[in-house]
Swiss-Prot record:
Residues 54-81 form a coiled coil. GO terms for cellular component: extracellular region. The gene is PLAC9. The keyword Coiled coil applies. It comes from Bos taurus (Bovine). This is Placenta-specific protein 9. Its main location: secreted.
Amino acid sequence: MRLLLCALAGLALLRAPGAFAADEPFIPSRGDSAQSTGCDTYMAVHSRLDVIEETVEKTVEHLEAEVKGLLGQLEELAWNLPPGPFSPIPDLLGDGDDRF
């Protein structure tokens, strides 16, 4: 499951190269510059992680819907398949005699 999430996160990064760019230019706040730079970096990382999390969640929801649809189609196909060579012959007369 962790591998799937890593792959989905990688796909999200590849599909949206401009989604992680800052919307506003970086303007340092007044006060202690070392503390504000660290805080700004922390906030920027958090906002990027929020975007990645949202993208991964949407991708997972989309993939769940696709898998559900594919499973529905497979079930429908399984019900419509003719019996195979090793399938039991249906007892049409209902007498339970399986000699044939």
